[in-house]
């Protein structure tokens, strides 16, 4: 009989718990891009190799651009498995950003070429994963700064999405995506007012919706 392990949300985690949860084939999962007005929400799932440790893993938001790029390359080289999942603006508009993020996380885990024994997600919610019941799954609040596999996932997701914003900037340089990465800044609002809504904008987000009505 298959043993079912109930999912949980972990609010406080000790260093000892981090070590225990990091044993075996652990997939860390995180997202980048819930707040921007444009583009996909990007998620990543990473299974690290315990025999090839990576120093300096932490929340991607606390890393310099140079360090981000270096860690991205090291993760891609050393990890046992890396998968990126995304939800596009149409899916975000249809589902809302929370459910679209959960969908993207599910896609990231489904894309792993190694089956994890445990899935650890940053935050306080767990997606519906297409996994067997015996696979542990936990949401860890502020996990991107605590659990190495989640930190690695946050780095992969951020570098991936930032690169996509650079590509968008090359197509629409007047919007300034290289600088603000699609977030709701003054520059972005001014570009929306002057140049209008792009196909890649999230039409359900209020600043974009208001511009469509004007």
Curated annotation (Swiss-Prot):
GO molecular function: manganese ion binding; RNA binding; RNA-DNA hybrid ribonuclease activity
Catalytic activity: Endonucleolytic cleavage to 5'-phosphomonoester
Keywords, alphabetical: Cytoplasm, Endonuclease, Hydrolase, Manganese, Metal-binding, Nuclease
Cofactor: Mn(2+); Mg(2+)
Alphabetical list of PROSITE patterns matching this protein: RNASE_H_2
Record GO cellular component, one term: ribonuclease H2 complex
Domain RNase H type-2: start-end pairs: 24-214
Binding site for a divalent metal cation: 30-31, 122
Top-level taxon: Bacteria
Family matches, as HAMAP family: RNase_HII_B (MF_00052_B)
Function in brief: Endonuclease that specifically degrades the RNA of RNA-DNA hybrids.
Entries under PANTHER family matching the protein: RIBONUCLEASE H2 SUBUNIT A, RIBONUCLEASE HII
Name recorded for this polypeptide: Ribonuclease HII
Annotated source species: Shewanella denitrificans (strain OS217 / ATCC BAA-1090 / DSM 15013)
Lineage: Bacteria, Pseudomonadati, Pseudomonadota, Gammaproteobacteria, Alteromonadales
Gene giving rise to this polypeptide: rnhB
């Amino acid at each position: 009989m298959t043993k079912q392990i109930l999912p949980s949300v972990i609010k406080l985690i000790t260093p000892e718990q981090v070590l225990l949860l990091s044993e075996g084939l652990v997939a860390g999962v995180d997202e980048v891009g819930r707040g921007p007005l444009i583009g996909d929400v990007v998620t990543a799932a990473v299974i690290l190799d315990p025999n090839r440790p990576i120093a300096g893993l932490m929340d991607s938001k606390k890393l310099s651009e140079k360090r981000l790029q270096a860690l991205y390359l090291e993760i891609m080289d050393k990890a046992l498995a890396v998968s990126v999942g995304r939800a596009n603006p149409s899916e975000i508009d249809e589902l809302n950003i929370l459910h679209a993020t959960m969908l993207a996380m599910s896609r990231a885990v489904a894309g792993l070429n190694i089956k994890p024994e445990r899935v650890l997600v940053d935050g306080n919610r767990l997606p519906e994963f297409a996994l067997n019941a015996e696979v542990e799954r936990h949401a860890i609040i502020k996990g991107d700064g605590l659990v190495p596999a989640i930190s690695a996932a946050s780095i992969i997701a951020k570098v991936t999405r930032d690169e996509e914003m650079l590509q968008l900037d090359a197509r629409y340089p007047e919007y300034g995506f290289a600088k603000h990465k699609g977030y709701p800044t003054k520059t972005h609002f001014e570009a929306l007012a002057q140049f209008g809504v792009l196909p890649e904008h999230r039409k359900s987000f209020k600043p974009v919706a208001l511009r469509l009505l004007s």
